[in-house]
């Protein structure tokens, strides 16, 4: 759903896959996103990214989203992605998975 729009920018708020799937191919000039980390926080939303049963499922969810991002990006579009590594910092419970055995 559109969250904000003016003559220079449109911001969307909602489930990433649902919003992206509703957009036409090549219609976005820039995507700025910071997906939730795996196993770090529960936002209380069914189907939320980061609450998958395993790191492999988490990666698969991100791949699905970014395949749609690629589809909607213009040929000269840019993606700004903030994706931290909570495994490296040890700041997460990571759903009980150890850093060396996950991916």
Name each model-derived stretch.
Residues 1-103:
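S-adenosyl-L-methionine-dependent nucleic acid methyltransferase catalytic domains
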């Amino acid at each position: 759903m559109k969250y904000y729009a003016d003559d220079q920018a449109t911001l969307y708020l909602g489930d990433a896959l649902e919003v992206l799937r509703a957009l036409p191919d090549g219609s976005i000039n820039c995507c700025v996103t910071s997906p939730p980390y795996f196993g770090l926080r529960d936002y209380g939303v069914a189907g939320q990214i980061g609450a998958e049963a395993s790191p492999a499922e988490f990666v698969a969810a991100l791949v699905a989203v970014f395949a749609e991002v690629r589809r909607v990006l213009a040929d000269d579009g840019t993606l700004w992605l903030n994706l931290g590594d909570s495994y490296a910092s040890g700041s997460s419970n990571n759903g009980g998975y150890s850093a060396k055995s996950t991916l």
